[in-house]
Amino acid sequence: MRAGIENYIKNIEQSLELIWRSLDIESLTIRLTELEELTADPSLWNNNANAQILLREKTNIEEKLNVFNNLKSNFEDILELEAMAEVENDFETLNQIEQDFKKLSIIAAKLETECLFSDESDYNNCFLEINAGAGGTESHDWASIMMRMYLRFAERLGFKTQIINMINGEEVGIKSCTIRIIGKRAYGWFKTEAGVHRLVRISPFNAAGKRMTSFASSWVYPEIDDDIAITIEDKDLRIDTFRASGAGGQHVNTTDSAVRITHIPTNTVTQCQSDRSQHKNKAQAMKMLQAKLYKLEMQKRTDSVDKQNANKTDNSWGHQIRSYVLQPYQIVKDLRTDYETSDTKGVLDGNLENFVSASLAMNASGNKK
């Protein structure tokens, strides 16, 4: 057997074992049988709210079991083909089988990471905010590089994205942006990316070729479901309208279609300029505000709001989560998990899966630095 194929088989088998244990497939199978009996009872609909809860649980379990069973079935099918190709010395088929194992190992690793999702909101869409730190041109450029990195990361995971709001820098890059990430488990994949990111490189904007350090921060919060009620009093809101801006601060609309909403009690601000309609921008900004307030409330309940707010707002040395060094050597290191890689180009192109997996695993084990 080829070494490459052997390694892929070993990795997939390990992933299947971990997924089996993490999801507790046996218990899920038993629970699904119970739910099928409960939902088949016509009297269930006498209590519509309870019926909806049970149906959501049933759908969630069915999805988990289907994903696991499909992965296991595909693995067994390819193993069978590989055994026949080995006997027949069919090298062309073996080449294809090696690629099939490679693709399957990526899927298995993704599912293994998703087993670490523990919050109900992990399955939701999410919003990602990026804000440049102090430093003008350097930090604005770094913020735009981060935006590209996260857009690529979302694309790698099969998520759709929508740029809700973006404020361009005076010369290059962006001062800030808000991206809506659309897809099942989006928040689970992005939530550990919240914090301050530090870049060290030879400045492309400095004629002397000096090495510069730049900071930018990111904050992630889940889009909340419609059935979660967030009460916001009109008297607590300040709503401002303005013209949407383009590069260099140029106005791209002749009407005040962009909307900024401030929740006065918490000083929480959202804004949207992605649509030409002021009404639609206001609705989106309000939806973002509800999501932000929900996130803040959840943080308070878990006694982590102080830490999260520090990560969000303090673009300084003391609150970093990750360092990206491009010169004099190349390394990206997560300061929480110590996971690092020299593939700086890959990371900036959105290859962040290993960083996310390491953070989720650390949180699951409780071994926080």
From Swiss-Prot:
UniProt cross-references to InterPro entries, sorted A to Z: PCRF, Pep_chain_release_fac_I, Pep_chain_release_fac_I_sf, PrfB
Residues where N5-methylglutamine is found: 250
Keyword list, A-Z: Cytoplasm, Methylation, Protein biosynthesis
Cellular component annotations (GO), alphabetically ordered: cytoplasm
Main localization category: cytoplasm
PTM comment text: Methylated by PrmC. Methylation increases the termination efficiency of RF2.
Gene3D superfamilies referenced in this protein's UniProt entry, alphabetically: 3.30.160.20, 3.30.70.1660, Release factor
The keyword Cell membrane is annotated on this UniProt entry: no
Protein role: Peptide chain release factor 2 directs the termination of translation in response to the peptide chain termination codons UGA and UAA.
Listed NCBIfam families: prfB
More info: The gene for this protein contains a UGA in-frame termination codon after Leu-23; a naturally occurring frameshift enables complete translation of RF-2. This provides a mechanism for the protein to regulate its own production.
Stated name of the protein: Peptide chain release factor 2
